[in-house]
Amino acid sequence: MAHPVQLGLQDATSPVMEELVTFHDHALMAMFLISFLILYALSATLTTKLTNTNITDAQEMETIWTILPAVILVLIALPSLRILYMTDEINNPSFTIKSIGHQWYWTYEYTDYGGLIFNSYMLPPLFLNPGDLRLLEVDNRVVLPIEAPVRMMITSQDVLHSWTIPTLGLKTDAVPGRLNQTVFTATRPGVYYGQCSEICGANHSFMPIVAELIPLKIFEMGPVFTL
């Protein structure tokens, strides 16, 4: 999860998030290259004493500043498209869990376990235990397995919401009347936090998401819920 004064991204807990972190570094290198070239051109223009008022065109320079940006855009677009198709790929998920957004809480339905349904509300400050995170703890966590592809089917009962867990690289809009889906595979156990990432009304800031990831063997014994 995020920490105070954190400058980097959260630690990746899924292959997709690992790819996103790598792509972030890749795009940042391209940005540094562009910034360096622009700053160099500006400094050279300001410091040089060489001038020529008879120049009418510069074919070589125009060719360079046309081809170079095109090459940079291709180098950014190719890995971006690869990750885009990776996030949309659905390959025989082991489990399917449905998440329904409401103003202002989440409902989870385990379709593979007899249609078990429960709500997940943010814990008010008066109910927090020492060490709990303010505005991030919930009464019922969604329990998910690691090392197995899990399909999340996400929709909304009222207005637009967005089911987001940054460390898993997940952000899927919950749209009324529409069922969106995303698949992820978590790589290590733990408790991971997210929040609704679509402004959905007065209490938008008070509908957190808490996913408790446990080993697959334990999950297969029967989901463990904090009900």
UniProtKB/Swiss-Prot annotation:
Membrane topology listed for this record: Multi-pass membrane protein
The residues that the entry says bind Cu cation A1 are 161, 196, 200, 207
Write down what this protein is called.
Cytochrome c oxidase subunit 2
What family is this?
Belongs to the cytochrome c oxidase subunit 2 family.
Q: For this chain's UniProt record, which GO biological process terms are given?
A: ATP synthesis coupled electron transport
Q: Which keywords accompany this UniProt record?
A: Copper, Electron transport, Magnesium, Membrane, Metal-binding, Mitochondrion, Mitochondrion inner membrane, Respiratory chain, Translocase, Transmembrane, Transmembrane helix, Transport
Q: Which GO terms describe its molecular function?
A: copper ion binding; cytochrome-c oxidase activity
Oligomeric state and interaction partners are given as: Component of the cytochrome c oxidase (complex IV, CIV), a multisubunit enzyme composed of 14 subunits. The complex is composed of a catalytic core of 3 subunits MT-CO1, MT-CO2 and MT-CO3, encoded in the mitochondrial DNA, and 11 supernumerary subunits COX4I, COX5A, COX5B, COX6A, COX6B, COX6C, COX7A, COX7B, COX7C, COX8 and NDUFA4, which are encoded in the nuclear genome.
Identify the main location: mitochondrion
Q: Which GO terms describe its cellular component?
A: mitochondrial inner membrane; mitochondrion; respiratory chain complex IV
Which cofactors are reported in the record for this sequence? Cu cation
What this protein catalyses is: 4 Fe(II)-[cytochrome c] + O2 + 8 H(+)(in) = 4 Fe(III)-[cytochrome c] + 2 H2O + 4 H(+)(out)
Tell me which Pfam families the record gives. Answer: COX2, COX2_TM
Per the UniProt topology annotation, the Mitochondrial matrix ranges are 46-59
- How the cofactor binds, per note? Binds a dinuclear copper A center per subunit.
The record ties this protein, via InterPro entries, to: CcO_II (IPR045187), CcO_II-like_C (IPR002429), CcO_II_C (IPR034210), Copper_CuA (IPR001505), Cupredoxin (IPR008972), Cyt_c_oxidase_su2 (IPR014222), Cyt_c_oxidase_su2_TM_dom (IPR011759), Cyt_c_oxidase_su2_TM_sf (IPR036257)
